Amino acid sequence: MSVRLRDPHFKLRFRLTRVHNLAARYAYGDDVAEGIGEVVRPARSYTQAQFLELCRWKSVRTQPRCEENDAALVEAVTTVALTTPHEQLRIEVLTLLRGVSWPTASVLLHFGHRDPYPIVDYRALWSLGIDEPPARYDFPFWWAYVRTCRKLAADAGVSMRILDRALWQYSKENQATLRSP
């Protein structure tokens, strides 16, 4: 029996014309992550060191678990994720790695894949009208999020990295003040 999940309703909380301005105020260092992406995209896999650096960039808390993955497994799993044409396999295979949840998997795709992928993060989701992130991510939610972000980036004429920075920054500046008690 198959259960069809309802697509989430994403609604941008700010005007799309503000993307550049918001992204320019983003100050969470991502130069190292972007540099890793420049090396990984043509290689089509992560080394263990690159993997650990991006996992640390996303979440220091999960670092000990991420370090439990051996280099061969990291390379094998990330090669599948970065070379398969199957969208669901791209994201879900990454969660086979210890310490990698959907948000961290999205970081690995965001920086390492040739196609544009957003980073799934509570801040970005909030900027898209989702007050509480799902307790458990699944592919239908992820794919709706990817499609929404790709359309927004295209409509704004920006890269996925610029859109991600803008979504994160808007939440940082507004989420606490706009939350209802």
Q: Which functions belong to the PLM regions below?
A:
Residues 1-53, 59, 118-181:
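C-terminal accessory module of base-excision DNA glycosylases/AP lyases that mediates lesion recognition
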Residues 87-90, 104, 145:
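N-terminal alpha-helical segment
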Residues 81, 85, 115, 140:
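A short glycine-/small-residue-rich loop at the edge of a beta-strand within enzyme catalytic domains
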